[in-house]
Amino acid sequence: MKIENIIRRVLRESIQIEELGDGFIEVFIMSGDEVVGDMTLETSDNKHYMVVMATIKEEFKGRGLYKQALLELLRIMPNIIIQSAFRSPEAERAWRSLIKQLPNHIGHRIENILDIEMISIFNK
């Protein structure tokens, strides 16, 4: 197997995406063959996807898998904008860390809407 195919296979294994209908997608966060977390995102326009729920198994927290999953989702779906508004303290730390370490081709925007901080990440 060519190295490019191996790399693509490994990247595909880091997340799996399932369309749930009614504007929702489920992103399964993988470690090898094991589902270690998931995110539910909602869209009304197939462009802006709001994270409405995210979980990671306790033993996998702190490994950056949530941040990796967000970046991988942007790689797979390059024309979307991922948004987060209501974050747990753990998610807040993950988003702050992500913003500090964004690759050069990923942009971000922070807006305050009705006293709620919305963070958006997107491909430039």
Positions of PLM-derived features:
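Conserved GNAT acetyl-CoA-binding A-motif
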Residues: R75-E90
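Conserved acetyl-CoA-binding loop-helix of GNAT-fold acetyltransferases
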Residues: I56, G62-R75
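Conserved active-site tyrosine of GNAT-family acetyltransferases
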Residues: W95
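GNAT/GCN5-related N-acetyltransferase fold signature
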Residues: L41-E42, I56
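Short acidic, low-complexity intrinsically disordered linear motifs used
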Residues: M1-Q16
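Conserved beta-hairpin
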Residues: E18-D38
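Conserved acetyl-CoA binding element of GNAT-fold acetyltransferases
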Residues: K47-E58
